[in-house]
Swiss-Prot record:
It comes from the Bacteria. It holds the Pfam family YchJ_M-like. This is UPF0225 protein plu2503. Belongs to the UPF0225 family. It comes from Photorhabdus laumondii subsp. laumondii (strain DSM 15139 / CIP 105565 / TT01). InterPro entries: NTF2-like_dom_sf (IPR032710), SEC_C_motif (IPR004027), UPF0225 (IPR023006), YchJ-like_M (IPR048469).
Length: 159
C-alpha cells in the first residue's frame, strides 16, 4: 500500500520526502527542502528539522519545543505559493501557506510565511522566515480547494 507524501507533491512518500528524512538524499532545491521540512513536522521527525536548520541558528536548543509542538499540532496541508532566487545561487526564498489544527483550541489555522534558505557546500538549509506584508493573504482563491486537504473550498474551511 502506498502513502502519498504529506508535502502535497502527489508523489509517493517513499519516492518524495522519505529519503530526505532518512538522510539518504539531500534536497537539491530550496523548495524540496521546504517540502521535506513540512513532511518532517507531519512525521514528527525532530532530528531532520534540527539538522536542516542553518548551523548558525543552533536549532538543537529548540528540540524540546519542536517535540512538544508535535503533540498539539496536526498538520493538514501545504501550499507552495512561489519560489524565487535570492541575491545569488546560494540563496532562495519559498513562500507558502500551511493549514494545521491546534489541538488545544480545536481551531484550524493557516500559517503564511516567506522562508529564506541558504546553500552551503551543496546543502540547502532553512535560515529564517517572515510573515509577508500585513494585509496580503496567500494567493488562494476563495473557491479554490483548501490547502489543508479537507476537500472543501478555502472559504468554507481555513479561509
Amino acid at each position: 500500500m502506498t502513502e502519498l507524501c504529506p508535502c502535497g507533491s502527489g508523489i509517493d512518500f517513499a519516492d518524495c520526502c522519505s529519503p530526505y528524512l532518512q538522510n539518504i538524499k539531500f534536497a537539491q532545491t530550496a523548495e524540496s527542502l521546504m517540502r521535506s521540512r513540512y513532511s518532517a513536522y507531519v512525521k514528527h521527525n525532530a532530528d531532520y528539522l534540527i539538522t536542516s536548520w542553518h548551523p548558525d541558528c543552533q536549532a538543537e536548543k529548540w528540540r524540546l519545543d519542536i517535540e512538544q509542538s508535535f503533540i498539539v499540532t496536526q498538520w493538514l496541508g501545504l501550499n507552495v505559493i512561489t519560489t524565487e532566487k535570492g541575491e545569488n545561487d546560494n540563496e532562495a526564498y519559498v513562500e507558502f501557506s500551511a493549514c494545521f489544527l491546534d489541538q488545544k483550541s480545536q481551531d484550524k489555522q493557516l500559517i503564511h510565511e516567506r522562508s529564506r534558505f541558504l546553500r552551503i557546500d551543496q546543502h540547502w538549509y532553512y535560515i529564517d522566515g517572515v510573515k509577508p506584508i500585513d494585509g496580503i493573504k496567500p494567493q488562494i482563491g476563495r473557491n479554490s480547494p483548501c490547502p489543508c486537504g479537507s476537500g472543501k473550498k478555502y472559504k468554507k474551511c481555513c479561509g
